[in-house]
C-alpha cells in the first residue's frame, strides 16, 4: 500500500518527491508538507517507542479464537514443479479432511510473479500450539505422509516457514470460489512498531473491503520476527489495479498510508495462482 508514497534508493525508504517532479501525485500546501516532512523525519531518527504492557499476541490477536497459522515457502527445482504440485494435491487434502488432525489447509499456491518456481501453503491449527504439536506427532506415524516428505525433499532447493497469529480486525480466511489470483504482501517492520501498525490498519482495513478482496492479515510469532503478511484476492491483475487505485479516492486512506510508511523496513509482493485443490480458488 506504500508504493505511491515511496521511492527506494539503496534500500532506504524515503518520501516521494513533490508533484512537480511526479505528475499526478496529490499536492498539499507547503506548510502542511513541511510539517509532515518534519514529522516523518523525526519518526525515522528520534522515534520514541512507548513501553508495552503486554505481548503482541495478547494485544493484537483475536481473543475469541486460539488459532495458529503456519505459512510455508518451498522453492522447488524448476524441472520438478509439476511433480511437486501433483504429490501436494494428492496428500495435502487428506490431511485437511482428516478428522484426526486439528488443522485446516487455508490455501496452497504457486508464485506467479515474485520468486519463481515457488510453492506457498497456509495452514490453520485450531487450538494453537498444542494442536500444532498434535498434528506433527500424528503425521510422523502416517506412512503416506512420511513417503510424501521423502519424495518432496528431492524436489526442493530450499524451504522456510513462519508461525503467525491473525490480527483481530481481519476476517478469518474462508474458502471462496474462483477463479481468482492472490496477492501476498509481506512487510518487515521496524522493531517496536507492531502495535502502531495494528492501530493504523484497524482503521485502514475499512477502505479495502468494498470488493471483498481482503482475505486475512497476520503477524509473525516464530520465524522472521516483526513480519506482517496481508493476503488479498482479485479476479485478475487489472481488477487489482482498479481496486487499489480506487482506495486513493477515499478520504482518510492517503493519511493512513503516509503514517505507516516509516514503520516499514522492507516489503515484498507475490502474485500467486491457487492449485486445483486449494480451498481458496
Curated annotation (Swiss-Prot):
Pfam families per record: NIPSNAP (PF07978)
GO cellular-component term (any): mitochondrion
GO biological process: mitophagy; positive regulation of high voltage-gated calcium channel activity
GO molecular function, one term: protein-macromolecule adaptor activity
Gene3D superfamilies in UniProt: 3.30.70.100
Annotated localization: Mitochondrion matrix; Cytoplasm
Keyword field: Autophagy, Cytoplasm, Mitochondrion, Transit peptide
Transit peptide as recorded in UniProt: 1-27
InterPro entries in the record: Dimeric_a/b-barrel, NIPSNAP, NipSnap_domain
Family matches, as SUPFAM superfamilies: Dimeric alpha+beta barrel
Subunit structure: Interacts with CALCOCO2/NDP52, NBR1, SQSTM1/p62, TAX1BP1 and WDFY3/ALFY. Interacts with ATG8 family proteins (MAP1LC3A, MAP1LC3B, MAP1LC3C, GABARAP, GABARAPL1 and GABARAPL2). Interacts with VDAC1.
Summary of the function given for this chain in its UniProt record: Protein involved in mitophagy by facilitating recruitment of the autophagy machinery required for clearance of damaged mitochondria. Accumulates on the mitochondria surface in response to mitochondrial depolarization and acts as a 'eat me' signal by recruiting proteins involved in selective autophagy, such as autophagy receptors (CALCOCO2/NDP52, NBR1, SQSTM1/p62, TAX1BP1 and WDFY3/ALFY) and ATG8 family proteins (MAP1LC3A, MAP1LC3B, MAP1LC3C, GABARAP, GABARAPL1 and GABARAPL2). May act as a positive regulator of L-type calcium channels.
Family of this protein: Belongs to the NipSnap family.
Protein name (database record): Protein NipSnap homolog 2
Species this protein is from: Mus musculus
Amino acid at each position: 500500500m506504500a508504493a505511491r508514497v515511496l521511492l527506494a534508493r539503496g534500500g532506504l525508504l524515503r518520501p516521494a518527491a513533490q508533484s512537480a517532479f511526479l505528475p499526478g501525485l496529490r499536492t498539499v500546501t507547503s506548510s502542511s508538507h513541511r510539517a509532515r516532512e518534519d514529522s516523518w523525519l523525526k519518526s525515522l531518527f528520534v522515534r520514541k517507542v512507548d513501553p508495552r504492557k503486554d505481548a503482541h499476541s495478547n494485544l493484537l490477536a483475536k481473543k475469541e479464537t486460539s488459532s495458529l497459522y503456519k505459512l510455508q515457502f518451498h522453492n522447488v527445482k524448476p524441472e520438478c514443479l509439476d511433480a511437486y504440485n501433483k504429490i501436494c494435491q494428492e496428500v495435502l487434502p487428506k490431511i485437511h479432511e482428516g478428522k484426526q488432525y486439528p488443522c485446516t489447509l487455508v490455501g496452497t499456491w504457486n508464485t506467479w510473479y515474485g520468486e519463481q518456481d515457488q510453492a506457498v501453503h497456509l495452514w490453520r491449527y485450531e487450538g494453537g500450539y498444542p494442536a500444532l504439536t498434535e498434528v506433527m506427532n500424528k503425521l510422523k506415524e502416517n506412512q503416506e505422509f512420511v513417503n510424501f516428505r521423502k519424495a518432496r525433499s528431492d524436489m526442493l532447493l530450499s524451504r522456510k516457514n513462519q508461525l503467525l497469529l491473525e490480527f483481530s480486525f481481519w476476517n478469518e480466511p474462508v474458502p471462496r470460489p474462483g477463479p481468482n489470483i492472490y496477492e501476498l504482501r509481506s512487510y518487515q517492520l521496524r522493531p517496536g512498531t507492531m502495535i502502531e501498525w495494528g492501530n493504523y490498519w484497524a482503521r485502514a482495513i475499512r477502505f479495502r473491503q468494498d470488493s471483498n478482496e481482503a482475505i486475512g492479515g497476520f503477524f509473525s510469532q516464530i520465524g522472521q520476527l516483526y513480519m506482517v503478511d496481508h493476503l488479498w484476492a482479485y479476479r485478475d491483475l487489472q481488477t487489482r489495479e482498479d481496486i487499489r487505485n480506487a482506495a486513493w479516492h477515499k478520504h482518510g486512506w492517503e493519511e493512513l498510508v503516509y503514517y505507516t510508511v516509516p514503520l516499514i523496513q522492507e516489503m515484498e509482493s507475490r502474485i500467486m495462482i491457487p492449485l486445483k485443490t486449494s480451498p481458496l480458488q
